[in-house]
Amino acid sequence: MKTDTIDQPKTFVNTRMKSLFVAQDKKPATLREINLARLTPFQRGLLVMDGTVTRFIEAYTFAPVKVVLLQQRKQILSTEHPWLQLPAGEEVISRQVTLQTPVQEKSVPIIHTYADSLIVPQRLPKSILDGLKSDKQGLGRLLRCSGLEARRELLWCGIETLSDLPSAVAHLEGENFINRAYLVFANQEPLMLINEKFPFE
């Protein structure tokens, strides 16, 4: 069986993956390398796409995706945040959501994504800030509806064993998830750092 990981050199897949994730060598120590051959086409699509994850999941599952807001709060950075280009003492918004679809004849929905974001409010237009007050819209949809010209920059990816989760998704602790991190830029400034986690099994 193939055991390609992003760290392996001189294959088309790994060369291409390294070109997509610009900071793979700086991924957190808690992330393990991904065995690319073990991913399904759906998982590979989620890993590398630079569009709206919600739309992709809806197209794949033929089901409406519900954005469930788990937690959102303002916090003050205790140290400098180099990825967001912010000094210590700046205010950010911490936001955690799940993207899930209903299952017929079952009360428990399927969780496709758990997303943890740090957002720089002073760099966002009022329409997005107002939209953040709703628990029914994902960040991708808010960005698109705002008309803001934004781009995504993929940073790193890996396999993560989830821990320290909000109570609503605490049952996922100990499970392995595919993790990817990326920045959203507009006007040459980072607006948010997003960590998206997708079920591995």
What does each model-found stretch correspond to?
Residues 2-178, 184-201:
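N-terminal domain-onset segments
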